[in-house]
């Protein structure tokens, strides 16, 4: 069933904030201490350009099917997870309707890195009958080189000179919410690398460093 002129509203954002966000400052950790690497990490990350303002493009047409509107929302969530710009695609079952209780698997890609999402359709929004609530949970996370750089320079602002990491790719699949194999060290202005680094983690709302 193709539903015309129906928009979607994200209700999973509340869960994302509760489980993945720390108001952008992840220098506060859960007891983990920096780990000595005994050598300077090989990859230098300089300050990235700001994320572009405005809506992610292209956006759905006014008469887009429900599945297209949902795919667009998942593209936005994928960009938030990556914390970076890049080629993003999304695909949901074309016959996916907006009936409450419907479940489906959708797929997004960021620079060719694929993420599958468990999607559950809810009821009509209390704001409008043209808005449909849904939850979308990624099965995997994404880490990006630019996303990690943007996080570190955003957290440490004017105190950071540069960051060193162990070769984070442009984009790579990573487990959600747990320590990944990638690590970074923040080098402060006027200082030299110490050899102490901390792990980088993927979350559904962007990378974290602790």
Language-model regions, residue ranges each:
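Extracellularly exposed regions in secreted/surface proteins, prominently low-complexity, repeat-rich
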Residues: 33-35, 151-210
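Short, non-transmembrane alpha-helical segments in secretory-pathway proteins
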Residues: 57-89, 141-168
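N-terminal low-complexity, Pro/Thr/Ser-rich intrinsically disordered segments
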Residues: 32-73
């Amino acid at each position: 069933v193709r539903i015309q002129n129906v928009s979607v509203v994200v209700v999973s954002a509340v869960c994302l904030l509760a489980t993945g966000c720390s108001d952008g400052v992840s220098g506060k950790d859960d007891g983990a201490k920096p780990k000595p690497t005994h050598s300077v990490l090989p990859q230098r990350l300089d300050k990235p350009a700001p994320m572009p303002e405005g809506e992610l493009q292209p956006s759905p047409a006014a008469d887009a099917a429900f599945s297209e509107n949902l795919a667009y929302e998942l593209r936005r969530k994928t960009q938030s997870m990556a914390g970076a710009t890049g080629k993003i695609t999304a695909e949901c079952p074309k016959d996916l309707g907006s009936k409450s209780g419907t479940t489906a698997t959708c797929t997004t890609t960021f620079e060719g890195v694929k993420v599958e999402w468990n999607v559950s359709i809810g009821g009509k929004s209390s704001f409008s009958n043209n808005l449909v609530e849904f939850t979308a949970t990624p099965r995997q996370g994404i880490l990006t080189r630019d996303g990690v750089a943007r996080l570190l320079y955003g957290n440490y602002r004017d105190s950071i000179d540069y960051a060193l990491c162990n070769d984070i790719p442009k984009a790579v699949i990573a487990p959600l919410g747990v320590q990944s194999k990638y690590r970074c060290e923040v080098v402060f202005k006027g200082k030299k690398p110490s050899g102490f680094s901390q792990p980088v983690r993927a979350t559904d709302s962007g990378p974290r460093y602790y």
